[in-house]
Amino acid sequence: MTLSSEREAAKAAFLSANGFGDVRRESLGGDASTRAYERLHRGEQSYIFMDQPPSLETAPCPPDASPAERAALGYNALARLAAGRVDAFVACAGWLNAQGLSAPKVLAADPAAGLAVLEDLGDDLYARLIEAGTDEAPLYDAAIDGLLAIHAAPTPKVLRYDGSTWPLLTYDDLALKTAHDIFVEWQPRFRDISFDAAALAEWEAIWAPIRAKGEADATVFCHRDYHAENLIWLPERDGAARVGMLDFQDAVLAHPAWDLSMLLHDARRTVSPEREAACLDRYLAARPELDRTAFLAGYHALGALNIIRILGIFARLVTRDGKPRYADFIPRLWVYLDVCFADPALAELKAWFDRYVPVETRR
């Protein structure tokens, strides 16, 4: 029996054991990871079948690993990623549902086997609806309300749901450093530039206090991939539950500005300055305890870090992985970064880019 046939047999056995042996199966393909999805049909009902084969990705970050141990384990441990673990998805989904939010309900799961049957939230992705002409204002308002609900909730250090347990680790100094250093590792291979020891020393000196502030304020559940291709519009539901949330298994404890940046610095679609301002105003109006100037400084600093991280990832996808389509998204990210650089608190970072990253390479 081949590996693929063994996997198919395991999937069929799982479905049968959990009351889904009689469904019609429709392949939906995969996502950017090793996961694959099917839609299961039974009469008028449909469900989503998630298949995350074990051992295809390296291990997630152990909660107590030292920096040296994380470096030895590799990128997932350095960045504090879940390595596609189904138990992470199940535990995060359960926590989000407990807050009254619309993560897919887990109907059956075998985390060790990497299999789960989920509630089907439909196909109305924010990105798809907006591209088709749907008014984006209520969608983004609801997305902000979703973040407000998440940020208002007490966040445990360990998530537990239906037998699955998952540590909610902090987006700490090392994970943040790993994020911004992707840029200086991969941008030179994408554009003909180089960073000498002096440039890299300046880079680290600029980022160290930003990372320290980011870790100190890491107090909320952070979806980590909260953008228009991972949000589903559910207008028949109420309030923040109108936002269906996907792809949250890499959640961490982080600064509340991180997911705002993911939403408003969307790499795949342009979020206008007017929409960004309206969303930030909505968020801050609901949180009068925050100092607006201080919060926006954090938003611009961590937003810049996030944008720079994505620039590095896309450079890696183009140069190492042979995926040239990601180059199409890069100019948009530079526009977002220029907006962040307008914050006087980022004058040093802007000056670094002006010295070492020529404008003609920012494309």
From Swiss-Prot:
GO terms for molecular function: ATP binding; kinase activity. SUPFAM superfamilies: Protein kinase-like (PK-like) (SSF56112). GO terms for biological process: cell wall organization; peptidoglycan biosynthetic process; peptidoglycan turnover; regulation of cell shape. The keyword Kinase applies. The keyword NAD does not apply. Pfam families: APH. Keywords: ATP-binding, Carbohydrate metabolism, Cell shape, Cell wall biogenesis/degradation, Kinase, Nucleotide-binding, Peptidoglycan synthesis, Transferase. InterPro entries: Aminoglycoside_PTrfase, Kinase-like_dom_sf. Its EC number is 2.7.1.221. Transmembrane segments: none annotated. It catalyses: N-acetyl-D-muramate + ATP = N-acetyl-alpha-D-muramate 1-phosphate + ADP + H(+); N-acetyl-D-glucosamine + ATP = N-acetyl-alpha-D-glucosamine 1-phosphate + ADP + H(+). Pathway: Cell wall biogenesis; peptidoglycan recycling. Belongs to the kinase AmgK family. Sugar kinase that catalyzes the ATP-dependent phosphorylation of N-acetylmuramate (MurNAc) and N-acetylglucosamine (GlcNAc) at its C1 hydroxyl group, leading to MurNAc alpha-1P and GlcNAc alpha-1P, respectively. Is likely involved in peptidoglycan recycling as part of a cell wall recycling pathway that bypasses de novo biosynthesis of the peptidoglycan precursor UDP-MurNAc. Is able to complement the fosfomycin sensitivity phenotype of a P.putida mutant lacking amgK. This is N-acetylmuramate/N-acetylglucosamine kinase. It comes from Caulobacter vibrioides (strain ATCC 19089 / CIP 103742 / CB 15) (Caulobacter crescentus).
